[in-house]
Amino acid sequence: MVDVNRFKSMQITLASPSKVRSWSYGEVKKPETINYRTLKPEREGLFDEVIFGPTKDWECACGKYKRIRYKGIVCDRCGVEVTRAKVRRERMGHIELKAPVSHIWYFKGIPSRMGLTLDMSPRALEEVIYFAAYVVIDPKDTPLEPKSLLTEREYREKLQEYGHGSFVAKMGAEAIQDLLKRVDLAAEIAELKEELKSASGQKRIKAVRRLDVLDAFNKSGNKPEWMVLNILPVIPPDLRPMVQLDGGRFAASDLNDLYRRVINRNNRLARLLELNAPGIIVQNEKRMLQEAVDALIDNGRRGRPITGPGSRPLKSLSHMLKGKQGRFRQNLLGKRVDFSGRSVIAVGPTLKMYQCGVPREMAIELFKPFVMREIVAKEYAGNVKAAKRMVERGDERIWDILEEVIKEHPVLLNRAPTLHRLGIQAFEPVLIDGKALRLHPLVCEAYNADFDGDQMAIHVPLSEEAQAEARLLMLAAEHILNPKDGKPVVTPSQDMVLGNYYLTMEDAGREGEGMIFKDKDEAVMAYRNGYAHLHSRVGIAVDSMPNKPWKDSQRHKIMVTTVGKILFNDIMPEDLPYLQEPNNANLTEGTPDKYFLEPGQDIQEVIDRLDINVPFKKKNLGNIIAETFKRFRTTETSAFLDRLKDLGYYHSTLAGLTVGIADIPVIDNKAEIIDAAHHRVEEINKAFRRGLMTDDDRYVAVTTTWREAKEALEKRLIETQDPKNPIVMMMDSGARGNISNFSQLAGMRGLMAAPNGRIMELPILSNFREGLSVLEMFFSTHGARKGMTDTALKTADSGYLTRRLVDVAQDVIIREDDCGTDRGLLIRAITDGKEVTETLEERLQGRYTRKSVKHPETGEVLIGADQLITEDMARKIVDAGVEEVTIRSVFTCATRHGVCRHCYGINLATGDAVEVGEAVGTIAAQSIGEPGTQLTMRTFHTGGVASNTDITQGLPRIQEIFEARNPKGEAVITEVKGNVVEIEEDASTRTKKVYVQGKTGMGEYVVPFTARMKVEVGDEVNRGAALTEGSIQPKRLLEVRDTLSVETYLLAEVQKVYRSQGVEIGDKHVEVMVRQMLRKVRVMDPGDTDLLPGTLMDISDFTDANKDIVISGGIPATSRPVLMGITKASLETNSFLSAASFQETTRVLTDAAIRGKKDHLLGLKENVIIGKIIPAGTGMARYRNIEPQAMNEIEVIDHTEVSAEAVFTAEAE
């Protein structure tokens, strides 16, 4: 076997007959499988041991040679080689076909490769191959056309007319093989190239297609006649096994049935030929053989599929590769692994951030080999077998050993569905009793886990390297930030939020107000003994907290705070300011001066003067965590998070916040509001009956009335709510629920959607406290059911979107430090009409500048070129009034097969500059796909009938953008740059005409009458600007403008959809995806290169081809950029392994084989498929060959020395 980590590329070609013979270990002549009495394989049958190797290790078939010492001997009695039984997975056989047979992939695929090679229609081919017509191979001196078809009758007539032997015509695959042998590739290619110079229309398209196939054969060295088989390989028997079931019956792979039919028909054909049977019988047998081989290769591709028992179609070789259950996706990309287990999860509130609880019996099974090794090392048992028995008996001593073994040995926890990389994290195991895994409550958000019965899987990294990577790169305490937006993903939730909210509340006039304490301990003592309340405002000596960053003016004073806040601040990192107010000013600039007593001032006076602060809510805690991370990085942050969690749980327990029906308030003026609404609706209906409004207007007015009534109730609810009400506290703190839940409990449920999505006019007037009537209950079931079905559909859609995104971007890896490009991207805030969807500050953070940025007024240089823009710098730039900045962007990066560090910027998951080897493509795909389920499914109608455009939003719009489809409600765009001179309406055709005067000429655009205009007369418009509301069709924009403007447009559109749903995603992720959609060009004119016109190729390959020609002084080729949807882009990737494992497996492999494609294994997927370590992260070539050395022996290498990775050309290493 070849070592998988040594080879660098993998090629697929057509197999020549000699190649098939060289693979084969013998011919399979009989259809028999195994003998039903002896259960031994039959000689010369499909499981023959002579051909395929022994069924038992080191043992021949007759038993003369047993044991390993006879290795390599071929038995003289039975002819079987003594070797390992696993050769039955590798050795192939063959069948000598008595008549040539066409390969169905090349004849039936679209486009038919055989048809293109011979310039015959697939229909004609089918008639010849399946013996319905003769084809003229060599007309000799007769006036017959070569390749023309003759029916049986015409053939006989022509024979009589011209005499026997005057021309050659045959039928069946044999005829096709003769024709293919006669194809002169070089001559045909030259002819087609000539034809292309003049041809146009359909003729040109066909010529380009034929040229493509012929050129592929010419360059790859494959011969066209190999598309017809004379010899059929038989795959190894262990890949099509036959196993005995209980009860003596056998279960065999379908392939055995299919092979058996081929062999039967082939043998019968041989006998008929020997007997010189009549032509028609032989023909029929040849046709049946052809059909049998077709079924074996791809059952069901042509005609009715061959069925097994119970009319189930048999699974052919093609089906073994295809689809989710096929070889690629089931066994190569998704293997089951050893050392794993799964169990229900329960909450582990006492765990540290980096720990998880593992049940004892699970741990002993997972760590069995480690425990056994220790048992032997400690000499509790003499050998491994005895140690194993000890573990299985459950000896008392194994538990102490287990404790030792798992110390510092991280395990991985995974929850399905793994939507982003935070779905697998590493923890240190802690042994617990019970049978459920214990999970730290703060990592739940990353996993999207809850404890209502979720299950999780646990995996053990075995090797030292795997453990090191798990500990350093995957430990849960390291994953504070979410890779999609760089915001903390471990924010406290529910009880923890509630506890800290209650703790930081302030209240006037509670016991102990105005007391002054010398330090924290005294304050806590007073609180514990009932002298001071948590919420009462008290004084504390500032000097008792010397490590806090006080201003000089604040030292040696007394500060007014609450006992709760003293406890709250006690867990904060030392260098953070003392937090009094839940706002960013206090967090970043320090405690406000108004809380400090001047010498001799009365504390009660100050307390009375101060406003009562609102408590700290979930959002404020999130900000504190983000600030902590920014200042102190992961270790301190995770320790702080644990303290926050413990404090929150402790105080939410102490507070004893409960919910009863009496906690839901009654709104005093509900009846008045509802009566007023009824009255208004009555008036609207009256007006409608009088004909003063249309039915649509009435519907809109009625629904608006009820919506306003609901809002009025909500407003009243907020005005009258008691801040100490537990439900209000839960809602206000962000622990659970929101105002809409609250208003359904206390206000009214309001309008409901009918099953067709239209909103019903009858609202639900009751709330849950009063209870719903039967009719109201019935109405509300529509909405509930729609919610459930929508969610289910959305999950599947979103999952498929993620899969396509991952596939198209999986080979984008950070390959080098700096690509040295001189291009950049000009960015400004993204706006949607008047609203800003993404501010400039957000877009600048963590990117490198392309040019220096100057202050617009003073002209001072704020930041130089090629510098990293930090959060503070971004704020400084925006505050200076700069509106647009040119940055380094993924769009303009010049790195091949990836991106460079400077064009990418910081890694959002760590907040530091991205490292070479980071798989940014996969991260981008996950970041866009993971929030997919939060997007809505609906296609909105804009407020009734105002416009005729349906605006697609949510998930369908994202799919529309990434698949580069023509959008619904397309906008009209201008092709000329200039001014709008007039807009005239034409009532007869119900259209408007827009005239744009450019420098070169006048552009005239017809838009529908109802379309909303975006421009007015006198407006200046650029090329590609939208004249009407709606989405621009990106392919059209690409024709009118350039690649960069299309990329910018797509980026802005994706961001609009996500931001409108309140989901933040870093620009760079969208940039990576959009760049992949635009990485191909189509060759228009080949110039002096040997490219073919109409070929799709990578931009980098195209530039290379041109570079050589320009250097030698020739004419370079010209090309056009092509925008491809992500599905198409994945299938057009350079790696055939990646494309085949994605979709349309047979088509991809057919095409790759004809071209003799080489897969250079640059992406992640290809390497996973062949079982090689992936070329990202620590698997990159530059990191693979580093030998570990002791720190003092060598100077630490400067990181820039390691950063410039050459993108290697792939051949044998």
Swiss-Prot record:
CDD domains: RNAP_beta'_C (cd02655), RNAP_beta'_N (cd01609). InterPro entries: DNA-dir_RpoC_beta_prime, DNA-dir_RpoC_beta_prime_bact, RNA_pol_asu, RNA_pol_N, RNA_pol_Rpb1_1, RNA_pol_Rpb1_3, RNA_pol_Rpb1_3_sf, RNA_pol_Rpb1_4. Pfam families: RNA_pol_Rpb1_1 (PF04997), RNA_pol_Rpb1_2 (PF00623), RNA_pol_Rpb1_3 (PF04983), RNA_pol_Rpb1_4 (PF05000), RNA_pol_Rpb1_5 (PF04998). Mg(2+) binds at residues 450, 452, 454. It catalyses: RNA(n) + a ribonucleoside 5'-triphosphate = RNA(n+1) + diphosphate. GO terms for cellular component: DNA-directed RNA polymerase complex. GO terms for molecular function: DNA binding; DNA-directed RNA polymerase activity; magnesium ion binding; zinc ion binding. One of its GO terms (biological process) is DNA-templated transcription. Its EC number is 2.7.7.6. It comes from the Bacteria. Its cofactor is Mg(2+); Zn(2+). DNA-dependent RNA polymerase catalyzes the transcription of DNA into RNA using the four ribonucleoside triphosphates as substrates. This is DNA-directed RNA polymerase subunit beta'. It comes from Streptococcus pyogenes serotype M28 (strain MGAS6180). The lineage of its organism: Bacteria, Bacillati, Bacillota, Bacilli, Lactobacillales.
